[in-house]
């Protein structure tokens, strides 16, 4: 198992790749919220921890929080993010 960090900015349709979006626009969602991501990860059955008091490094003035999620070694971070996006829509 490996641990990955997930920021809501990774899914934000309004952001460019340079601004931190990690998934293709076709997978993106508008204004992703940490609580929505948490509920999906809970349904998927993954272990996670939340840090609500951190700001995304590209926007240090905005506190949005992040998740640390435990996933299978064989699963890539991008594949996991895409699966989350499918479930968010």
Swiss-Prot record:
Pfam families: SRP19. It comes from the Archaea. GO terms for molecular function: 7S RNA binding. One of its GO terms (cellular component) is signal recognition particle. One of its GO terms (biological process) is SRP-dependent cotranslational protein targeting to membrane, signal sequence recognition. It is found in: Cytoplasm. InterPro entries: Signal_recog_particle_SRP19, SRP19-like_sf, SRP19_arc-type. Keywords: Cytoplasm, Ribonucleoprotein, RNA-binding, Signal recognition particle. SUPFAM superfamilies: SRP19. Belongs to the SRP19 family. Part of the signal recognition particle protein translocation system, which is composed of SRP and FtsY. Archaeal SRP consists of a 7S RNA molecule of 300 nucleotides and two protein subunits: SRP54 and SRP19. Involved in targeting and insertion of nascent membrane proteins into the cytoplasmic membrane. Binds directly to 7S RNA and mediates binding of the 54 kDa subunit of the SRP. This is Signal recognition particle 19 kDa protein.
